[in-house]
C-alpha cells in the first residue's frame, strides 16, 4: 500500500475496478475464500471472433475476470481462465459455492445455444485449473415439462442436498445430491410478499444461512439491490421470507414510470473464515462518466441484529488503510443569527461552518453525536466545500426519518437507535466516489465529480421558527454538540490495478 494517490483522475485509490478501460456489465461473481486467499470474479464483455450464438452481441462475448486478495482490499489480477476459448460459450451471472468435497465451483448462465445454466468446478485451490463445464438439466417441472434454468442461477446447500434456481418473477427450484442428476422441487418461496411490487423479477441472487436465518440477496432489474430474510422450511423445501429491504435508492432525475435504479446492483457475497458475511455490488448507473468503468462498492459486512433488522458496516479491514489521524472533541456549533448569509427569511436560519481541511482525495471521516442532541434537528455536513463551492451535501432529516447524500435519499429513523447508542456516521471518500454508513443501519453511495474544487469539511445546522424582531433566540435548536470527529487519510490500495492496467494479464482470448 502507498500513501500516494493514483495520478489518473478516474482511477480510484481503494475501490475495486476494472483496469482495462470501458467495460460493461461488471457483475461480481464466483466469490470464495480458499486457503488464506479471497477470490472474486466479475463479468467482462470483450471482443470475440470465435463461433457466434443466437441473441449474443455480434463479435463480442463474456468472460469472468479473476482477482485475488489476502484482505479484500489489495487485489491482484490473475490470468483469465473462465472464458469462451475454454468453456465453449460466453459466461454470464451466477454464484460461487464450495462442493461437499471442499472444491470451489460455480453455477452460471452460459451464453450458449441453447441458453442454459452450467456448473464448473476447480481442480486446484489457486483456481488456476478448471474442469470443463457441463449443463444443469433438471427432470420434471411445474407444467409437466422439464424445467429450465436459464438466467442468473444460484445454488445453496442444505445438509447433503444442493438446491438451484434461476432468475424469474416466479422462481422455480430443483435439487441434486451429486450436482449431476437434478429433479424439480417447486417454487423457491411464497409469492405476493409485502413490500414488493407485482412484476419485480428476482435476479443476480445469492442465498445463504445467515445468523440462524436465511438471507436471499438479489436484485430486481428496475429497483436494484434488495434482500429477503427468513427461514428455510425443510419439510416443504421452501424459503419462507419474513422481511424484505432495499439497498438501492432512487435519484430525483430517474423516471417514476420506467424506474431503473441500478446504482447498487448485481450483488455477490463471501463468508470469511471468522464467520462474517461480506458483499459487493456493481455500481451500474452511478454516473455517466463512471458507468463503463466496472467499479465495485466497498466490501460491506452484513449481520443480523437481535431485533431482526439487517446491519450493514464497512469491511473491518478498511481500518488498515488509516493513517495521520486528526481528532476533534466536544465541538459546539452555533448558528450565527447575525450573519446575513445564514438568514433565509425572518423566521428561518441555516448555518454552515468550516470544521477542517480534508486530507486529500482519499479519506475516512467518523462523526459521533449523542442521540439526544440530534433528536428533532435537521443537520449535516458538506465535503469538498469552500467559500465558493457548496461541495457534496449529507443531510440528516430527523423530522422525516430520512438521510440524504447529494441526490440520493434513503430511510433512516433516529428513533430506531437505542437511547444509549450514539449517532455514528462514517464517510469514505475515494476521489469522486463517496460512501456513507450510519450506525450500521443504512448506507448510501454517490459520485461527486467536482471533488477537487473544494477541500473543506463544513458543518450544517438548520434552525427555524425564530423571531428576530423580538430578539428571541431558541438556543436549543440553534446549537449542535458533536462528541467527536476523527479524520484519517487512507492509503492507496490499488497498486495491483496499475500493474494490471499495464500488463493486461487478465485479457481474454478473442477466438
PLM feature spans:
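Beta-rich accessory regions
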Residues: 2, 223, 233-254, 258-262, ...
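Beta-propeller domains
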Residues: 2-20, 29, 35-80
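Blade-edge beta-strand/turn elements of extracellular beta-propeller
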Residues: 6-18, 70-84, 125-144, 173-197, ...
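Residues that flank catalytic or metal-binding motifs in active/ligand-binding sites
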Residues: 12, 27, 62, 92, ...
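Conserved loop/turn at the beginning of each blade in beta-propeller domains
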Residues: 24, 89, 146-148, 200, ...
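Hydrophobic core segments of beta-strands in well-ordered, beta-rich domains
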Residues: 27-55, 77-82, 92-121, 135-174, ...
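Beta-propeller blade signature
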Residues: 63-71, 117-125, 170-178, 227-235, ...
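Surface-exposed loop/turn positions within WD40 beta-propeller blades
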Residues: 168-170, 179, 222-224, 431
Amino acid at each position: 500500500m502507498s500513501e500516494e494517490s493514483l495520478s489518473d483522475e478516474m482511477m480510484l485509490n481503494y475501490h475495486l475496478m476494472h483496469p482495462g478501460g470501458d467495460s460493461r456489465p461488471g457483475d461480481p461473481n464466483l466469490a470464495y475464500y480458499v486457503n488464506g486467499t479471497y477470490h472474486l470474479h466479475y463479468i467482462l464483455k470483450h471482443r470475440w471472433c470465435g463461433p457466434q450464438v443466437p441473441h449474443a452481441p455480434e463479435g463480442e462475448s463474456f468472460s469472468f475476470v479473476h482477482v485475488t486478495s489476502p484482505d479484500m482490499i489489495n487485489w491482484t489480477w490473475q490470468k483469465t481462465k473462465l472464458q469462451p476459448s475454454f468453456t465453449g460459450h460466453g459466461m454470464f451471472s451466477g454464484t460461487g459455492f464450495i462442493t461437499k468435497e471442499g472444491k470451489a465451483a460455480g453455477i452460471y448462465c452460459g451464453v450458449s445455444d441453447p441458453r442454459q445454466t452450467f456448473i464448473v468446478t476447480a481442480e486446484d485451490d489457486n483456481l488456476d485449473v478448471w474442469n470443463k463445464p457441463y449443463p444443469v438439466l433438471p427432470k420434471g417441472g411445474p407444467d409437466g415439462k422439464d424445467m429450465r434454468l436459464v438466467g442468473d442461477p444460484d445454488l445453496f446447500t442444505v445438509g447433503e442436498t444442493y438446491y438451484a434456481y434461476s432468475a424469474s418473477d416466479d422462481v422455480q427450484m430443483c435439487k441434486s445430491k451429486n450436482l449431476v442428476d437434478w429433479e424439480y422441487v417447486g417454487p423457491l418461496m411464497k409469492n405476493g410478499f409485502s413490500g414488493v411490487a407485482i412484476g419485480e423479477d428476482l435476479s443476480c441472487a445469492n442465498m445463504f444461512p445467515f445468523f440462524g436465518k436465511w438471507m436471499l440477496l438479489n436484485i430486481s432489474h428496475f429497483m436494484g439491490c434488495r434482500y429477503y430474510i427468513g427461514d428455510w422450511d425443510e419439510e416443504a423445501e421452501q424459503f419462507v421470507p419474513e422481511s424484505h429491504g432495499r439497498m438501492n435508492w432512487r435519484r430525483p432525475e430517474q423516471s417514476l414510470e420506467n424506474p431503473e435504479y441500478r446504482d447498487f446492483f448485481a450483488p455477490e457475497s463471501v463468508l470469511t473464515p471468522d464467520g462474517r458475511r461480506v458483499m459487493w455490488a456493481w455500481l451500474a448507473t452511478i454516473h455517466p462518466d463512471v458507468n463503463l468503468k466496472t467499479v465495485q462498492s466497498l466490501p460491506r459486512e452484513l449481520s443480523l441484529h437481535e431485533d431482526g433488522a439487517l446491519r450493514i458496516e464497512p469491511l473491518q479491514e478498511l481500518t488498515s488503510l488509516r493513517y495521520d489521524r486528526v481528532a476533534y472533541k466536544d465541538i459546539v456549533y452555533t448558528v450565527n443569527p447575525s450573519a446575513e448569509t445564514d438568514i433565509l427569511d425572518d423566521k428561518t436560519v441555516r448555518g454552515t461552518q468550516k470544521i477542517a481541511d480534508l486530507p486529500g482525495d482519499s479519506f475516512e471521516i467518523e462523526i459521533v453525536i449523542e442521540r439526544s442532541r440530534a433528536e428533532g434537528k435537521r443537520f449535516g455536513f458538506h465535503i469538498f466545500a469552500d467559500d465558493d463551492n457548496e461541495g457534496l451535501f449529507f443531510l440528516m432529516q430527523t423530522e422525516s426519518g430520512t438521510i440524504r447524500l447529494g441526490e440520493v435519499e434513503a430511510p433512516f429513523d433516529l428513533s430506531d437507535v437505542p437511547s444509549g447508542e450514539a449517532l455514528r456516521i462514517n464517510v469514505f471518500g475515494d476521489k469522486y466516489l463517496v460512501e456513507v454508513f450510519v450506525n450500521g443501519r443504512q448506507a448510501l453511495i454517490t459520485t461527486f465529480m467536482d471533488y477537487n474544487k473544494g477541500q473543506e469539511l463544513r458543518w450544517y445546522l438548520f434552525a427555524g421558527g425564530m423571531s428576530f424582531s423580538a430578539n428571541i433566540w431558541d438556543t436549543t435548536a440553534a446549537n449542535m454538540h458533536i462528541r467527536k470527529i476523527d479524520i484519517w487519510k487512507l492509503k492507496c490500495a490499488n497498486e495491483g490495478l496499475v500493474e494490471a492496467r499495464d500488463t493486461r494479464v487478465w485479457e481474454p482470448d478473442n477466438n
